[in-house]
Amino acid sequence: MSWRDDVLTVLERDPAPKSFSEALMFSQGLHAVLLHRISHRLYLRGQYKIARMINYWARVLTGADIHPGAKLGEGVFIDHATGVVIGETAVVGKNVNIFQGVTLGGVSTAKEKRHPTIRDNVTIGAHATVLGNITIGENVKIGAGSVVVKDIPPNVTVVGIPGKVVVKRDKERDRLREVRRESLPDPLLEALTDICASLDSMERRITSLEEQMKKP
């Protein structure tokens, strides 16, 4: 994934930037992601001090503190980077949306996996906190201000302190509901069809009457 893909991700999910160049120049969340990708590569090569230096200036410039050791997948979108904190052993999957003030933190000082794993297609609302070596399943939505401290299964919505599942999303049920909705008749379309049919019938009757009147 190139830096251009990260810019396109911003354009797809944020209506504010009007152009590629505007997103590239002024999106703090994008800057945080791009600078992290650079620092992460250096971190993996063992160039820890340079990686941490980039991390430091990224925090100063964007307001987001993303440890160089954290792993961010493709299509990660940070909207309003201010206050975002992502710890060293955090793993963030593909197409994850992160809003301002989000913390992916640890509850231990042990030299081991101590930060959350966020699966694909997750949305984390503003000022939500996810703590510990826990896993957030695919397609989960975490409400603004929530505090999550335990594993969350896929396809649910979580809110509150501590975070509780309030909505279970059944993808197959949603698909069938959409199919049924699409298959339902459109009253307006049916009415227009009836009107057009009536006009055709009237036109034929008028034509027939005109032909009869022409006969001697």
Task: Please place each PLM-identified region on the residue numbering.
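Terminal amphipathic alpha-helical/low-complexity segments used for targeting or macromolecular assembly
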Residues: 1-58, 62, 173-216
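Structural signal for interior beta-strand "rungs" in well-ordered beta-sheet cores
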Residues: 59-166
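Short, well-ordered secondary-structure micro-motifs
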Residues: 169-170
